[in-house]
Amino acid sequence: MPGSRRVRPRLRALLLLPPLLLLRGGHASDLTVAVVLPLTNTSYPWSWARVGPAVELALARVKARPDLLPGWTVRMVLGSSENAAGVCSDTAAPLAAVDLKWEHSPAVFLGPGCVYSAAPVGRFTAHWRVPLLTAGAPALGIGVKDEYALTTRTGPSHVKLGDFVTALHRRLGWEHQALVLYADRLGDDRPCFFIVEGLYMRVRERLNITVNHQEFVEGDPDHYPKLLRAVRRKGRVIYICSSPDAFRNLMLLALNAGLTGEDYVFFHLDVFGQSLKSAQGLVPQKPWERGDGQDRSARQAFQAAKIITYKEPDNPEYLEFLKQLKLLADKKFNFTVEDGLKNIIPASFHDGLLLYVQAVTETLAQGGTVTDGENITQRMWNRSFQGVTGYLKIDRNGDRDTDFSLWDMDPETGAFRVVLNYNGTSQELMAVSEHKLYWPLGYPPPDVPKCGFDNEDPACNQDHFSTLEVLALVGSLSLISFLIVSFFIYRKMQLEKELVSELWRVRWEDLQPSSLERHLRSAGSRLTLSGRGSNYGSLLTTEGQFQVFAKTAYYKGNLVAVKRVNRKRIELTRKVLFELKHMRDVQNEHLTRFVGACTDPPNICILTEYCPRGSLQDILENESITLDWMFRYSLTNDIVKGMLFLHNGAICSHGNLKSSNCVVDGRFVLKITDYGLESFRDPEPEQGHTLFAKKLWTAPELLRMASPPARGSQAGDVYSFGIILQEIALRSGVFYVEGLDLSPKEIIERVTRGEQPPFRPSMDLQSHLEELGQLMQRCWAEDPQERPPFQQIRLALRKFNKENSSNILDNLLSRMEQYANNLEELVEERTQAYLEEKRKAEALLYQILPHSVAEQLKRGETVQAEAFDSVTIYFSDIVGFTALSAESTPMQVVTLLNDLYTCFDAVIDNFDVYKVETIGDAYMVVSGLPVRNGQLHAREVARMALALLDAVRSFRIRHRPQEQLRLRIGIHTGPVCAGVVGLKMPRYCLFGDTVNTASRMESNGEALKIHLSSETKAVLEEFDGFELELRGDVEMKGKGKVRTYWLLGERGCSTRG
């Protein structure tokens, strides 16, 4: 590459040392690895803090595999490739290598990684016949095996970058020319120089194309214009090696110079992905983003940019290796390894050392020795190896095949993502399926312009034409000229016809005077919005909100505004006719429509669209009208839109813009009036106070003129808009100056004098945005050239008020739509809440009353009392509960009953029963109602009683865990009557002698036993499965002697009474 300097060692004399004198130290079974890397500066990808953990992981794998170097011990010795300043040195590295060779006689050298350090060490090792392994030293010159005969590079090399670029050019059809730009800093390891060198030499060799190169200094701004000139003259496909910030600056300058992605493509040679790096490693990033105010332009510029990096392995072995590398680096080297492409280097050192050990093992197996460096090296070359970085292929020259990735920007998100991967072994480009290369025109730009860089293509500069071509050209030009002339003649005839037709003329007799009050009432009756209860009521009502000084009349049934002109007569000159035509041509939503003009003396007047809401000045001065900033921005935007149309049309400027000439129609759209028709302006304006009051909006340069132009100037309109803007912001009147009570004449005199600083209205920054105040100041600047045009004002207002960009009514309707949507969401939310509460209420009702009874009540039906022929009733209580309660606190009693009944409730859910009530320690359950179940009620209650008795035996009292709870149960079968009693806290109650008998059965029972009546026993015998025992005749109150039984259990169950 032109301009490159060869890497030469300064210690050439050391090569003269006899190899035999250096073979000292070590033992027969030791294999010594000499490491020559930066030991303190961790910024290098091959620093010892990064590579050391990888080497230890590799040696641990060697030790764990008995087939590798059996009987040998690998030991490491370290030497630094840094000088005193902590940077790689072509002096320190060879000195360290000589010291290590003399003292330890190593079998292999690991490193260096820096090019200028590796060059002399590589020559030394070739002379000593000792292999050198490195994952650095990627320069093209290290691959010259005449000098570096035993150097093996297991990491990326720049000559492989040239192979990738060659494949890229072939795929995209770039076969002629490329341009390479690189930032070079003398004094360091010159990474960009060596990156570009490999690309430059390989692409020229493989493609036989022209590759121009240009060096620059990042910190010197004078270099950048030269680079852009070089790009214009020599390149459309440009490769740039620099820091991410320098590349971004170049892209911004290229955008400003018009070097866009339609004709140019810029490749950033960022092999370690520094511009894409984040805390999470390589993820979709925005390398154009800095937050400095230029991000929007930078994003646009980066549409022409692509980024080339090494391809990061994604195989599971590499991911696991990274985890172990980070842990070991933090634990033993006190260094934090971050995610990123730099981790490829320590991983490559790891794989290289394993490859070397494999080669040594094979050499020893063939009868060789560890000092046979040439044989070992040849075993590593032209070989494939599966390492943590994946499939590793060392070519015939001892260089690893390197994979690369091409990153491109997603035009929608602005994030860069991988679109192409390059396989260094197969030399194939593989597209990423979900991503595609983005080209602004849909295809890549050519590497040479269509007509060449200097327009030298003869096809673009034909000086001679054939006779047929000349005739065709002359004929075409003649036809085009004829059509153009015909068009202008037709247009002129139409114009003259329109001027003569006087479509604008209105006869005074056709005007019918109107009653403003009558019109206001009719307009009010047609309003569809009511102001009552609205924040905007003062704008939506018809009382007192109109321009009461506007003269109106009916013309052809339509109400129009009539402006009398204080002139005796109007000469209809050609100039006046053109003014009237231009007024008829104006069609804009924010300019009042010109209806016509009456030129019949003495009734000379102008007719325009009537806007019933009055002028902007009326609205601002009416304190009963509430204007929030949404309304104010809408009014301001309407003025800007109207003035933008006016300035870009035939009328050019207004000349009399003020708040009283801005009117609001029935749809709350602000329109500008009193524009154009300068020939109709009053020749003798008012005198005194009125004259000066009307000039408060006039620009100072116009005030200083003896005869200012009737149509004013565009800069003067901007000044007037600035005054109106202050009126809208403060609502304190025109040209309000805080603390001063000046007459209009005094204000005009001070503005005209041109004081320093210029005399202008006050700005209360508390009442509006600071940016809006700055816009006012720019609009009323003393120098007309410093005032922004309305196009810029429109853009500025959009930034201030992004949410409300349309007129008042549209914004109002939008807000009402939001309210409706919010109301729908609220109704849905409340409906769901209601349904949830309804579900809870029904669940509670089902717990208080039987399900069938609760359904009747929900349907609004009356629950009638009902007689049941046969049901079974269960009663139980706790023996000794009164004494237990006396010895316990009230809270302990409540806790006991809650625990017990919670247990009981869980048990009875498994049976066809209904819990009637609990009173104290009494528990009442029934089966057979309200839903009849035949004779099954006795069986269900019997089984339930057995289950409860079984549950109570294992029940533990919290405050008396050693005490057994003694449950007493009584059961009886018979007829009952049941119904709902009460309106408040209704209860489902049972009535009849069966209830009393069941209660007697319980009170006459015994603890931990189930007492049955003979009626229940008779029903249970139908099921032939229960074990019963005769108790005998028992004396019961009100019953006499009654024969009763004990329920012992059910056959097939383990429960016993």
Swiss-Prot record:
Changing residue 528 to A: Reduced phosphorylation, 50% loss of ANP-dependent activity. Homodimer. Chloride binds at residues 81, 113-114. Residues 1-28 form the signal peptide. The modification Phosphothreonine is found at residues 528, 541. Its main location: membrane. Residues 29-469 are extracellular. It is a single-pass type I membrane protein. Residues 872-1002 form the Guanylate cyclase domain. This is Atrial natriuretic peptide receptor 1. The chain crosses the membrane at residues 470-490. Belongs to the adenylyl cyclase class-4/guanylyl cyclase family. It comes from Rattus norvegicus. Glycans are attached at residues 41, 208, 334, 375, 382, 423. Pfam families: ANF_receptor, Guanylate_cyc, PK_Tyr_Ser-Thr. The keyword Lipoprotein does not apply. Phosphorylation of the protein kinase-like domain is required for full activation by ANP. It comes from the Eukaryota. Changing residue 338 to H: Decreased ANP-dependent guanylate cyclase activity. One of its GO terms (cellular component) is ANPR-A receptor complex. Changing residue 542 to A: No effect on phosphorylation, 30% loss of ANP-dependent activity. Residues 491-1057 are cytoplasmic. Receptor for the atrial natriuretic peptide NPPA/ANP and the brain natriuretic peptide NPPB/BNP which are potent vasoactive hormones playing a key role in cardiovascular homeostasis. Plays an essential role in the regulation of endothelial cell senescence and vascular aging. Upon activation by ANP or BNP, stimulates the production of cyclic guanosine monophosphate (cGMP) that promotes vascular tone and volume homeostasis by activation of protein kinase cGMP-dependent 1/PRKG1 and subsequently PRKAA1, thereby controlling blood pressure and maintaining cardiovascular homeostasis. InterPro entries: A/G_cyclase (IPR001054), A/G_cyclase_CS (IPR018297), ANF_lig-bd_rcpt (IPR001828), ANPR/GUC (IPR001170), Cyclic_nucleotide_synthase (IPR050401), Kinase-like_dom_sf (IPR011009), Nucleotide_cyclase (IPR029787), Peripla_BP_I (IPR028082). PROSITE patterns: ANF_RECEPTORS, GUANYLATE_CYCLASE_1, GUANYLATE_CYCLASE_2, PROTEIN_KINASE_DOM. GO terms for biological process: blood vessel diameter maintenance; cell surface receptor signaling pathway; cGMP biosynthetic process; cGMP-mediated signaling; dopamine metabolic process; intracellular signal transduction; negative regulation of smooth muscle cell proliferation; positive regulation of cGMP-mediated signaling.
